Amino acid sequence: MQETGVRNGAFGADKFGLKNLKQVHWNLGAPQLYQYSLSAGEAVLSADGALCADTGEFTGRSPKDKFTVRDATTDKKMWWAGNQSITAEQFETLYQDFLKHAEGKSLFAQDLYGGADPAYRIKTRVFTELAWHSLFIRTLLIRPEAIELSTFTPELTIIDMPSFRADPKRHGCKSENVVAIDFARKIVLIGGSYYAGEMKKSVFTTLNYYLPERGVMPMHCSANVGAKDDAAIFFGLSGTGKTTLSADPNRTLIGDDEHGWGPNGVFNFEGGCYAKCIKLSQEAEPQIYAASTRFGAVLENCVLDEDTRVVDFDDGSKTENTRSAYPLDFIPNASRTGRAPQPKNVVMLAADAFGVLPPIAKLSPAQAMYHFLSGYTAKVAGTERGLGNEPQPEFSTCFGSPFLPLDPSVYGNMLRDLIAQHNVDCWLVNTGWTGGKYGTGSRMPIKVTRALLTAALDGSLRNVEFRTDKYFGFAVPTALPGVPSEILNPVNTWKDKDEFDKTARALVGMFQKNFAKFEAQVDAEVRAAAPDVKLAAE
């Protein structure tokens, strides 16, 4: 077996059980990985120098194909209502079949950190059969210093082989595509999917499992920090604006998707960004556009002009879930440490497909826990398989249900405790629709959202007049300089006021129905933070 690159010779591929490999390329950088990827026909080069790959059938995560080993520990610890199980024996069979499938192949290995805080990071080794997947995960996680690689000993190992086909009868899964996690052995097996996002989310799921018991709350969020060390956290599902809104030229970006909040403050789990880039434009999102149109960026499922190789970001013919992966330092004002002090603001983003939530509302700590556990948004087409072309209302608890190994109340209680401990202001922001439901109304203007967020984060929104929303009970500003006052009260943007009232009451009912499963796990204060019961019943 040939091996190239810097590595820990005492802890190589054989320690993981990989044998009879043709070659292992260790910790290669972007130039070498570009070369291998292009020469193998895995990807093509854009006119701007980005590496462009197609993921084939799977253009998003496939949650139905994700499984966790159920053993004596996970049986009691895991949130099985939100996770699927396989036995230790089924996992072992799958693992051995992965090792057999790898024989004779050339693999790419990356040694990386999940987590910017040395006290809480997890040393992660990722084996991939594709060069562009190796570049992707190298871009998304945190790259150690070269001197650290010669002694790197992994805690978590991922093997990613899209050409592997699982057997549901043999392996206990549902299709030929599989993501299987064994927390006891700290091994993740990914087969059948060329969608690179499965790798990064496997690291996130692992950190979600281990960090709470160490006093760190893992979060599906973006984060940034102002000049006064005033960090802000942005919760939200894919497509709600986490990446876009945290890329603020007046604030330092900590990260765009996954963070921990603990005794030392906030820290990024990653060293890169994974931005949705459908309809990406230089005018609307200059930082993300610049980061996506240069050497070192990895583009997924973007359409290129056949002659010029110029990327057409408006073309969603392959999928609406086109993606750009790039290192954090491609953003000019990104943090070099990936860390920030205790946050001053928490923002929950919801793409409200019904068009009845206000563009911004202030939440009490109890309301914050209620809306965090509810995790309301609209699933946007393309971020997962099996969705149609229209957004669908979705309650994804903790704004990240697919990534939660533990019961949601674990994360909800941590959030409320941290908010109280650090006196954090909480906001609910609607980045979805205004002036009507999806199909009738229009998307909330990003300039309005940015203006309201700026006012919230710099403290000026605290000094304006608020009204209490009659449907949801939270506080909504009545006026703010530079923002049209009618947009602050959603009913004023609807032509049919009766239809608005009917739609708002229906959404209240949906919240109540969804939250019923959490009633027994929260106290009276959080139950009282729910939208008004009488309204839904009228």
Curated annotation (Swiss-Prot):
Binding site for substrate: R61, Y195, K201, R323
Binding site for ATP: K201, H220, G236, L237, S238, G239, T240, G241, K242, T243, T244, E285, R323, T449
Catalytic activity: oxaloacetate + ATP = phosphoenolpyruvate + ADP + CO2
Top enzyme category: lyase
Pfam families in UniProt: PEPCK_ATP
Annotated GO MF terms: ATP binding; metal ion binding; phosphoenolpyruvate carboxykinase (ATP) activity
Cofactor requirement: Mn(2+)
Record key words, sorted: ATP-binding, Cytoplasm, Decarboxylase, Gluconeogenesis, Lyase, Manganese, Metal-binding, Nucleotide-binding
Subcellular location as annotated: Cytoplasm
Positions of disulphide bridges: none
Pathway per the UniProt entry: Carbohydrate biosynthesis; gluconeogenesis
Gene Ontology cellular-component terms listed: cytosol
Residues given in the record as Mn(2+) binding sites: K201, H220, D257
Keyword 4Fe-4S among UniProt keywords: no
Signal peptide: none
Keyword ATP-binding: yes
Cofactor binding: number and manner: Binds 1 Mn(2+) ion per subunit.
E.C. no: 4.1.1.49
Domain of life the protein comes from: Bacteria
One GO term (biological process): gluconeogenesis
Protein's job: Involved in the gluconeogenesis. Catalyzes the conversion of oxaloacetate (OAA) to phosphoenolpyruvate (PEP) through direct phosphoryl transfer between the nucleoside triphosphate and OAA.
Family indicated by similarity: Belongs to the phosphoenolpyruvate carboxykinase (ATP) family.
NCBIfam families named among the record's database cross-references: pckA (TIGR00224), PRK09344.1-2 (NF006820), PRK09344.1-3 (NF006821), PRK09344.1-4 (NF006822)
Name of the protein this chain belongs to: Phosphoenolpyruvate carboxykinase (ATP)
Lineage, uppermost ranks: Bacteria, Pseudomonadati, Pseudomonadota, Alphaproteobacteria, Hyphomicrobiales
Gene transcribed to yield this protein: pckA
